[in-house]
Amino acid sequence: ACGVKLILHCFEYERPHAPELESICDKVFYYKRRTGVIANLTWLPYNVYSRKDHRLIENLLQNDYPILFEGLHSCYYMDDPRLRNRMKIFRECNIEHDYYRHLAKSGKGLVRNAFFKIEAMRFQAYQKVAQYANLIIAVSTTDADYLRKQFPNQRIEFVPCFHENNRITAKPGKSDYILYHGKLSVIENE
């Protein structure tokens, strides 16, 4: 409707393909995540390395369209020299190393907490990949301030996840549905 075509690249993990996406996207590509112990034997965050797939970069190289990297976990190819001349937009979901540190503090189980602590350290070291983005979009003003300090030479904009909250624009009444935004299997979202 807006004259924009979307090519969506997504990773399969704990859920099936979504045919609904094909009705709003020009193309939808699915990739399998590399999960398990082997995918964890790296200096990169597990949640980044597990999304490494040569077919993804091959598909990205088929055109010269802008690329939106949704979350730091999706940035494996952000610094790939073959994408040097592409418009790259990084939309952060949260400050990942802070998120994983909080998971480690609130989690149950020694191995699980150790994983979260290691992943926090990996993400803190890895966040420098955002310097390869032409634009960084922050989801909160606090995150925008943090990112401006970390990347003073980058263009950083604040675009909130939700509608403005100083007025209600929803129609009064009840509905059969309610929207929860968050992964409920994560301890912080329970």
Where are these regions (language model features)?
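Active-site proximal beta-strand in glycosyltransferases
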Residues: 67, 83-106
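A short, charged, and often flexible helix/loop element on the N-terminal side
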Residues: 28-56, 108-115
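Membrane-proximal helix-turn-helix segments that form the acceptor-binding/catalytic region
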Residues: 57-61, 96, 111-136
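Short N-terminal targeting/anchoring amphipathic segment
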Residues: 58-76, 87-89
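N-terminal strand-loop element at the rim of the active site
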Residues: 5-44
